[in-house]
């Protein structure tokens, strides 16, 4: 059976991410959710926080592991003997970047395939950026993230507000 990796920043982990994990985990023997360090993106949550959040949401999937990584995806995929990289495509605008990335990954890892999954209809518009922005303005994000993630957001926003005062 095949091992797949689903890499991302997951800042924060949304219902759309979980939707892709649920569907991909039914296809593969093992799915490794790779939480990327992504320091260049200046994530809202630390790597450790994003790993903990993803583990809280995905803890009931027996064939899913959550692992943090930094460096090249090709090295992460090799380290975990992955044969497939799972990527989500929310909109046509995602396709060009993801297509180029898949080509580069195929060049670097000729024996690893990229599988694109589109989210279920109700999750196509969700992005971590939108969720963070709505939450930071006191909006309701309960339809976009799980209750545990919403608690993390509220706590982090409150902590950041106190630090700015």
Swiss-Prot record:
Keywords assigned by UniProt, alphabetized: ATP-binding, Coenzyme A biosynthesis, Cytoplasm, Magnesium, Nucleotide-binding, Nucleotidyltransferase, Transferase
InterPro entries registered for this protein in UniProt: Cyt_trans-like (IPR004821), PPAT (IPR001980), Rossmann-like_a/b/a_fold (IPR014729)
Keyword Transport: no
Site (described: Transition state stabilizer): 17
CC per GO annotation: cytoplasm
Catalytic activity of the protein: (R)-4'-phosphopantetheine + ATP + H(+) = 3'-dephospho-CoA + diphosphate
Positions annotated to bind ATP: 9-10, 17, 88-90, 98, 123-129
EC nos: 2.7.7.3
Chain residues that bind substrate: 9, 41, 73, 87
GO terms for biological process, alphabetical: coenzyme A biosynthetic process
Subcellular location: Cytoplasm
Cofactors: Mg(2+)
General function of this protein: Reversibly transfers an adenylyl group from ATP to 4'-phosphopantetheine, yielding dephospho-CoA (dPCoA) and pyrophosphate.
HAMAP family with a match to the protein in the record: PPAT_bact (MF_00151)
The protein's assembly and partners: Homohexamer.
Family of the protein in this entry: Belongs to the bacterial CoaD family.
Protein's UniProt name: Phosphopantetheine adenylyltransferase
């Amino acid at each position: 059976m095949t091992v797949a990796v689903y890499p991302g920043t997951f800042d924060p982990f949304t219902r759309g991410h979980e939707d892709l994990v649920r569907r991909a985990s039914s296809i593969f023997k093992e799915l490794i959710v790779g939480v990327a360090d992504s320091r260049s993106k200046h994530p809202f949550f630390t790597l450790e926080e994003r790993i903990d959040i993803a583990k809280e949401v995905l803890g009931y999937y027996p064939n899913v592991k959550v692992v943090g990584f930094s460096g090249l995806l090709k090295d992460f995929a090799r380290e975990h003997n992955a044969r497939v990289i799972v990527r989500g495509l929310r909109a046509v605008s995602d396709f060009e970047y993801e297509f180029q990335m898949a080509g580069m990954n195929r060049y670097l890892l000729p024996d690893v395939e990229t599988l694109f999954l589109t989210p279920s209809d109700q999750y196509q518009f969700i992005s971590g950026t939108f969720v963070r922005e709505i939450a930071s303005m006191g909006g309701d994000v309960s339809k976009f993230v799980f209750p545990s993630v919403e608690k993390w957001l509220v706590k982090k926003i409150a902590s950041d507000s106190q630090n700015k005062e």
